[in-house]
């Protein structure tokens, strides 16, 4: 049996003391003159419960049949070995005993889903959420685990007495569930393996370039849908397998609906007030027996994200988003026969993957300075209590100051974001500002994709704006389909202007308060945030330096690099993939036609999978003698998954902004070549003609 409480997956350096993160003795902090700062090394080693991209309904946790234990997976990165360590953890829900690791090991299993007609999309880089399944007796867990590139089903004793693979096939297993203590049903797609083998055979004669290709993620055809799912049943005692019956398949496919609950004969669900309008508010609906549905008219019944029924107490509990720009989460209790909800808890931050256990919820919870942990939330009093924290020592570090910002932008839209200031910030001091996009709910780690280290940037002396993208103007209007709304948002880049205007409004607000130096503002972004970087550098004069994790927003990337299938689909959404860069659509975002007008130093930190899409824009900037650098990380995806790369991205981002916004350099000998390149870029910038002002 391994105790999670004393396990120390990685070592870090704090001053001259080398110790293990999560196991730093209290005396070490007490003896120190001051608490140590949050460095990139500390941030990259933080342990995560589940996947980095979890939402309120992501199934992060699994309660035992008797409710006495909760099981979950923890991942911790080690940049020295460049490995992610995975642990399957079991914790008593009463908190009376230490958590134990029932399994340690496995490879990084990428989250991939069918999309755009591909049977399996290219990995985004995020890890798949692994929700363990409890045996009916509560003695074992079954779960997916990848080793040597093969996804199998593993079984572990919940007492920590051992774990081993129990199901392996010629194809990857995609789901598993217990039928009884000795029988498992599982699913996978053997046809996918067969289709890949056919592509391999075809390659001997040469592949025809067609809609199977997505050049941005590789020079190989992708398998297209449909690929049938096969369901098998394994008898653990005899080892025999057979095809699953329809009833057994239904057991595996049955998933709880987070927006549906029963209390006695009353069914509660959520529906839009106008079913034909995709932007109409959602509200709670109750249907008693075979009677007519009754809509709850209370404002508190809108924007519900999760619900649970309690038949014993004749009560419905639900979580919802509320407050300014829906920046808070709240828990409500409502009598099943009254439709009068009462709020019992609310806060900024996130509750994720909640499971109800008697009179409380067990949830993954995070806030601005609190990484994801497990808590219990009392359904009567609303009291929150910690249950399990995989990063217990972070609070002993010298943490920056965080302020929640709210404003109404120039388009009348409610906005929230977070301002993060150095721990020793003195009121009235104007600091250089770094903007990190584009979600600011929960722990302020590295923004979307986790590439721009918020707390270490603040520790380095920057003010950091953790920017939460506003709702689009179109989202307040009536549309009958997402395609129609998307076309409206891309018309004249309407939504991108809304985002840029919001950023400028926030910069102006911080300038008026005397917090920032408006001449030293840096902008970062990944994915949609990268598009905002490209758009912002071309259409605004506010940014003195920028870092982007992908590039670029132009015709080549949208049409050529996305291939025939996706580029055709994008056009339906309002993206003009058949228009050249100098056409009216791309003129607002393309570096190719705007290079001579730009002067902002730009660092592109790209995955090798995506760098080809950056070359037209990067080359145009280079040929125009503009300060730009392209770094390529091998074997990476849209979101970087390798710990060594994440640490390198963290450090280079801080170095870039210190160089351009603070005129500071790191004297470390191994960074000498980096600063030689950057000083050459600075000299190049000083010699180049003045750029054309942005509109």
Curated annotation (Swiss-Prot):
Active site as annotated: 527, 610, 638
Gene Ontology MF: a single term: serine-type endopeptidase activity
Effect of residue 562 to A: Decrease in activity
Subcellular localization, as worded in the UniProt entry: Cytoplasm
InterPro entries: 6-blade_b-propeller_TolB-like, AB_hydrolase_fold, Lasso_peptide_isopeptidase, Peptidase_S9_cat
Any single GO BP term: proteolysis
Recorded consequence of changing residue 116 to A: Decrease in activity
The organism's place on the tree of life at top rank: Bacteria
Keyword Transit peptide: no
SS bond partners: 296-301, 354-363, 551-552
Effect annotated for changing residue 527 to A: Loss of activity
Site residues by UniProt (Important for activity. Binds to Astexin-3): 116, 562
Keywords, in A-Z order: Cytoplasm, Disulfide bond, Hydrolase, Signal
Stated consequence of mutating residue 111 to A: No change in activity
SUPFAM superfamilies found in the cross-reference section: alpha/beta-Hydrolases (SSF53474), DPP6 N-terminal domain-like (SSF82171)
Stored Pfam families: Peptidase_S9
Effect on the protein of changing residue 438 to F: Loss of activity
Site (Catalytically important residue that stabilizes the alkoxide intermediate. Moves to point toward the isopeptide bond): 438
Assigned GO CC terms: cytoplasm
NCBIfam families with a match to the protein in the record: lasso_peptidase
PANTHER family in the record: DIPEPTIDYL-PEPTIDASE 5, SERINE PEPTIDASE S9 FAMILY MEMBER
Protein name, entry field: Lasso peptide isopeptidase AtxE2
């Amino acid at each position: 049996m391994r105790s999670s409480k004393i396990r120390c997956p990685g070592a870090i350096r704090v001053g001259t003391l080398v110790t293990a993160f999560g196991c730093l003795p209290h005396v070490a902090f007490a003896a120190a003159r001051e608490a140590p700062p949050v460095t990139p090394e500390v941030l990259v080693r933080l342990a995560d419960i589940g996947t980095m991209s979890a939402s309120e309904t992501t199934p992060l946790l699994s309660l035992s049949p008797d409710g006495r234990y909760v099981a979950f997976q923890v991942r911790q990165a080690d940049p020295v070995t460049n490995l992610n360590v995975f642990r399957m953890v079991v914790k008593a829900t009463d908190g009376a005993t230490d958590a134990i690791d029932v399994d340690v090991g496995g490879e990084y299993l990428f989250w991939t889903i069918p999309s755009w007609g591909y049977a399996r999309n290219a990995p985004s880089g995020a890890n798949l959420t692994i929700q363990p399944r409890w045996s009916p007796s509560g003695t074992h867990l079954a779960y997916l685990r990848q080793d040597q590139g093969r996804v199998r089903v593993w079984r572990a004793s919940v007492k920590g007495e051992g774990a081993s693979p129990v199901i392996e096939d010629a194809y990857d297993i995609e789901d598993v569930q217990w039928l009884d203590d000795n029988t498992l049903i599982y699913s996978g797609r053997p046809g996918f393996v067969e289709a890949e083998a056919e592509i391999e055979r075809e390659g001997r004669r040469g592949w025809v370039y067609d809609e199977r290709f997505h050049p941005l993620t590789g020079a190989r055809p992708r398998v297209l849908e449909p690929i049938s799912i096969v369901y098998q049943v394994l008898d653990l005692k005899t080892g025999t397998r057979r095809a699953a019956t329809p009833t057994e398949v239904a057991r595996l496919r049955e998933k709880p609906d987070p927006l549906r609950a029963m209390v006695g004969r009353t069914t509660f669900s959520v529906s839009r007030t106008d079913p034909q309008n995709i932007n109409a508010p959602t509200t709670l609906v109750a249907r008693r027996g075979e009677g007519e549905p009754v809509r709850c008219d209370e404002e508190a019944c809108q924007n519900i994200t999760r619900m649970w029924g309690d038949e014993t107490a004749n009560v419905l509990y639900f979580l919802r988003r509320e407050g300014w720009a829906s920046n808070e989460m709240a828990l409500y209790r409502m009598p099943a026969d009254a439709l009068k909800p009462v709020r019992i808890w609310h806060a900024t931050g996130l509750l994720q993957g909640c499971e109800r256990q008697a009179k409380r919820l067990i949830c993954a919870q995070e806030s601005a300075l609190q990484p994801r942990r497990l808590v219990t939330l009392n359904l009567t009093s609303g009291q929150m209590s910690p249950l399990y924290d995989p990063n217990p020592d972070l609070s002993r570090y010298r943490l920056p100051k965080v302020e929640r910002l709210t404003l109404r932008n120039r388009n009348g839209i409610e906005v929230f974001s977070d301002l993060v200031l150095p721990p020793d910030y003195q009121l009235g001091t104007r600091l250089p500002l770094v903007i990190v996009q584009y979600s600011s709910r929960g722990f302020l780690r590295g923004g979307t994709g986790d590439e721009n280290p918020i707390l270490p940037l603040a520790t380095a002396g920057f003010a950091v704006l953790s920017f939460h993208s506003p709702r689009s103007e179109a989202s307040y209007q009536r549309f009958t389909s997402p395609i129609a709304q998307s076309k409206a948002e891309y018309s004249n880049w309407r939504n991108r202007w809304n985002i840029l205007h919001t950023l400028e409004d926030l910069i102006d607000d911080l300038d008026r308060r005397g917090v920032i130096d408006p001449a030293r503002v840096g902008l970062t972004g990944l994915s949609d945030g990268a598009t905002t970087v490209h758009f912002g550098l071309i259409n605004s004069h506010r940014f003195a330096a920028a870092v982007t994790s992908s590039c670029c927003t132009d015709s080549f990337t949208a049409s050529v690099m996305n291939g025939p299938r996706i580029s055709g689909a994008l056009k339906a959404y309002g993206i003009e993939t058949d228009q050249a860069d100098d056409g009216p659509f791309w003129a607002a975002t393309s570096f190719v036609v705007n290079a001579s007008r730009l002067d902002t130093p730009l660092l592109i930190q790209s995955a090798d999978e995506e760098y080809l899409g950056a070359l037209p824009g990067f080359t145009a900037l280079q040929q125009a003698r503009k300060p730009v650098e392209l770094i390529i990380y091998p074997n990476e995806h849209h979101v970087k998954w390798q710990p060594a790369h994440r640490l390198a991205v963290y450090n280079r981002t801080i170095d870039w902004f210190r160089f351009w916004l603070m005129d500071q350099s790191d004297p470390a000998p191994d960074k000498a070549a980096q600063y030689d390149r950057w000083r050459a870029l600075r000299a190049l910038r000083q010699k180049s003609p003045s750029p054309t002002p942005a509109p």
